[in-house]
Amino acid sequence: MSTGLLDDLCEFYQAKATVICGALGEDIYSRYPFTEKVITLRKQKYSFHWYHLWKKIKGTRWDVLCDLRSTPVTLLVRAKKRIILNKNKKTSQHRVIGLARLNPYSRNTLPRIWLKKEDLNQGKDLLLGHSPPFFVICPSANWEAKVWPEENFTQLSKNIMNSNYFKGGTLIIVGGPGEEEVGKIIMKKLGKINIINLIGLPIIPTAAVFCFSKLYIGNDSGLMHLAASIGTPTIGLFGPTDDNIYAPLGKNTMVVRTPESSEELMSDPDFNHRTSGSLMKSLTINKVEKIAFEMLRKL
């Protein structure tokens, strides 16, 4: 969600950027036109990754240092100006609104993704032989508690693909590496529908596919934010996570959440972050479908 802030920082200070990010963000930030260098941070035992990062950046006196993680290592390097996000300050503000406090223009800038021509061509190649319009679902997430049940995604997909909005079109299933099984289950149950299973595809070609898609529906996940940043009409499904903070932001986005608030779901005495199953079961197919058709009517 910080790509919009990066854009404004580079514009305001007329600067090139060195971006430090995790492996998932490497391909995204390397395509930003003002990126000079990307340093990929990979976690190591005993937090040694911070020491290795310090060695890479300590030799430079930075004009502007922006730290969104409030890491001590950034205090150990030279910088003319420091912009630090205070992560200790609890807030119910959306993440992007929180980042506006660091924005030199004092504005909320929507996240965005930069793609090259060859990226878009790769997206087209992945869709060759399949008929539009394209409807994307992401039935997985990095945490089981925020996963809407597979059978709900299956029935929702069937209903939407049989509607006038997508008749003759293609269902696309996306997700991260290691989440392939749910895609296979949905494909088996929806045998008569044209489906492309792209679960496990790298982030850039996935983003390119989103560019040609009419609608995205998925759990609260990075791919949800990616779709919204691309400009794909996006519906995010929420339960144990707070949509006030993590809702998808873009030109055309909506949220559907469980009747219970995130606080109510997380305060259950039987809740266990590591072992609890889906907390999304109270979110009905009818509710999601209603919002989907409402969005489609406005497109």
What do the PLM-derived regions correspond to, one by one?
Residues 1-299:
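Catalytic machinery of carbohydrate-active enzymes
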